[in-house]
Amino acid sequence: MLCIGDKIMDIDNIFSSLIKEIGYQNNKTVVINKVVMNSKEVEKNNLFVAIRGGNAYANEALEKGAFVIYDDNTINLNSNPNSFLVDDSVKFMQKLAHQWRNTLNIKIIGITGSNGKTTVKDMVFQLLSTKYKGKKTEGNYNNHIGLPFTLLRSEKNDDFMVLEMGMSDFGEIELLAKISEPNIGIITNIGDSHLEFLKTREN
């Protein structure tokens, strides 16, 4: 079982199609206090998701007492009981974030558009923060990696999240929407951004 805060997810059943090898025994409950992607931020009982070059820091994260999701089977973690070898770390985090979202009793506002996403996101967050507790997308964490990571940083006492959704290719907004299942959607505008990928404004 995987426990993040007070929420419990059956990691074996939900992610059986992605997990290649689980170091811990099936009867053990894995308790996570935070999800991180930056190896420099890793602390004990964090879940370190190794993405791209992050696999090289898997052993370092384990030494700090973290649990590790990694997708490079050439790395020798010596069957460490806190390690999870998966097919794809990004897809694993996306599925984990979606499952986590379904445990949250919060309102999620998704914001997209060719321009103005960040400004509108910040305005909505500031407005809601005068009365409620919540979180928003930080920096450029508005893609297929950043959005699920942001979702996984939410806390049990949050009332809302404002998620910025970026797009650079076909189907990206659909993917982000499926992961986060926003209650409210805001489109700032539809312009000529990313035409090098999308070809026409209609797309």
Give residue ranges: language-model regions.
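N-terminal leader/targeting and accessory segments in enzymes
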Residues: 2-95
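Phosphate-binding loop of NTP-binding sites
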Residues: 91-203
